[in-house]
């Protein structure tokens, strides 16, 4: 690691913080559960995106940019997507309606995370592009005696796995209804879960040995992580709410299909996000999307920069719960305002910040050390370069080239959404996006593709 402090991570699987030892230092592999693209991402979704972006940056710094593979999936087949498609596009055939929902939502997600200063993952597979891999794993589970067919569904037999429940530490006999576990009469055991279910004529489906159907939620991540990272990989991340049943069931499927002792060596989970001391929910009226926070005045009567949201998240340790509030955002904004605008050059990150990050991503201590460094950076160019290199590692001060890339990605995403709005004849929303970009100095030019005749939009920064 060449002078870099020893990296220690808390492992949910062992309930211990231990030294991280990658399977292959030349190819460190990390998988993080990404969005289900039926609705815009909310600030709770922003937390794992930011947390694991910091870890991605740290791993790249320690092992080298070309020696880390970060995969974050897109779930684009789900009953919630079907319901949203029927609600929002009742006049379209379901497949077209689903495509309209998923494309718009995925595009918005990419725009949101770009504004939060996040690097793109190396791989971002969609569930619908990996159906064959899911079917292959299900066939293995049936042949290995870990799955069965009942009432047209394929289910995982939880009692066939002696140590099922090792991640959540929940004994099998305690796993009754609740925690997103459905209990049905055709199950052998209450905790058995769906690997494949039949689709009606108007639902999305794929041909399989068990009839035309679609995958269960958990099998999707098992298939995508294996395809891009292998049977066993280094780190699997996500929110605390995913420990059970999602991650527990991923482990069960993957281990029983491939005959491995583990699926991932380290399991990391970030804590919950509350809003002003209350659980975030639409019924509470405190449901805040990333887009709303950045581009509307619904939270605190103003818009907030992406860097402020990012820093506000990093001011609490990732395993602790966050009470997301206007006060917290204001505190982060005041802190950012005191930091110098400098370029990293060839400087190395600050040792105190590196020590903090190497201690299970202690971003609280890292931000404190970075702020102390900022005071001297205003008057000392060398310290300023160190400050910039360190801030870049936290993603709160991107390199100029990455600022340009992030802005371009965000603009491209908004332009794509506007085109979809124009196609749907939703001119009010399209004009709103155009006005929003104009206010930021971005000029749009509408035209037609000479070959296809389709509407195209280009953009440029007004000089």
Swiss-Prot record:
It is found in: Cytoplasm. It catalyses: tRNA(Cys) + L-cysteine + ATP = L-cysteinyl-tRNA(Cys) + AMP + diphosphate. A motif ('KMSKS' region) lies at residues 279-283. Transmembrane segments: none annotated. It is an enzyme of class 6 (ligase). Binds 1 zinc ion per subunit. Its cofactor is Zn(2+). Gene3D superfamilies: HUPs (3.40.50.620). Its EC number is 6.1.1.16. Zn(2+) binds at residues 33, 221, 246, 250. Belongs to the class-I aminoacyl-tRNA synthetase family. This is Cysteine--tRNA ligase. It comes from Rhizobium etli (strain CIAT 652).
